[in-house]
Amino acid sequence: MDAITIWGCHNGQASAETAPLLGIRGTPKGKIVRAVTVSAYGASPVVMDLPTPAAGPGQVLIKLAAAGMNPMDVTLASGEWRPEPATFPMVLGVDGAGIVDALGEGAARFSLGDRIFGQLLISPIGSAGTYAEYVAVTAEAPLALVPPGLDLVGAAAVPTIGGSGLTLVESLEPLEEQTVLVIGAGGGVGSFAIQYAVIAGARVIANVRASAEERVRSYGVAQTIDDTTVPVGETVRRGHRDGVDVLIDLVSDAESFASLASLVRPGGTAVSTRYVADARALSASGVRGVNFVLRETSEVLERVAKDLLDGRIVAPPITRISLDQVPSTMRAGSRHRSEGKMVIVL
């Protein structure tokens, strides 16, 4: 086998020692790719050179064109979420889209040259991330063909936010004539969730910053509240004395979520995507507490893509950044609530 470089870090970039690399059909043997990694939980993200991954049995090698950024990526890198098993250096990123560059033995689901997208949370965590130029994953992962009419940047943006918005709302149906309060409505998941809730017949109250208010109103919400100018609780109680039927909270910590859940009527439901809902405590006031976890499937990806192409759903605005901008963007993202969707163009 040939000797090529492995990673060692200085000045935010990679340097090298030697290690073996197998040749990959469709990819030059010995090729080095760039990726964003952390060396340990809580370490600063850096751009590194890594050996190109190989497509093992049952795997596809994807030459990524774009990767969607998610709050989960910051949570993982910081160590706030520590799934097991994990490996370091940990390649970050879950959502991506690109071209099938190589096929491992027995990987018959896709063909070379196919445009595919999906959510690639692979065990051990960190062994395959989308903040990289290439990724090798099992062909049975939540992947789907990118339909004609949807570009790869747009496809990379939607796996987590579109899948979450669709399946979260469907888990709460029927929602017809229900009042749904969405906290963090201007972000990616919020943009999809409020649109699917409106389609389901809900009256949506969207907590959103002024900069995104016009866009969110265009989705058909009944009311918007900017919590930087007026208190959400006071505003909601004034218009809904008996409480709202459903709370969907995409951003709050445990303390803030518990306070907002007091706005839900007895018999209603309070959902957290940050896993901070205390179901036992909420049940004491007659509220069902739910910690939502996305279980992505290829079918969900196909449905979201079709809804986008049919104009049934409108994607949030995309901000494009380069791989080199990711470390600083992640640091800023840990301090600020984002609006729309950020995508790394590779």
What are these regions (language model features)?
Residues 156-229:
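Mid-domain Rossmann-like dinucleotide-binding core that forms the NAD(H)/NADP(H) cofactor-binding site
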Residues 109, 119-184:
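NAD(P)H dinucleotide-binding glycine-rich loop of Rossmann-like/cofactor-binding domains
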Residues 4-7, 11-33, 301-346:
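C-terminal hydrophobic helical "lid"/dimerization subdomain
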Residues 231-242:
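Short amphipathic alpha-helix with an adjacent loop that forms part of the alpha/beta core around
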Residues 253-313, 346:
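Glycine-rich phosphate-binding loop and adjacent beta-alpha segment
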Residues 51-69, 80-123:
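Glycine-rich beta-strand-centered segment in the early N-terminal region that forms part
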Residues 101, 205-207, 271:
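Conserved beta-strand positions in the Rossmann-like core of class I SAM-dependent methyltransferases
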Residues 5-12, 17-31, 40-65, 87-91, ...:
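A short N-terminal beta-strand-loop micro-motif at the entrance of redox/enzyme domains
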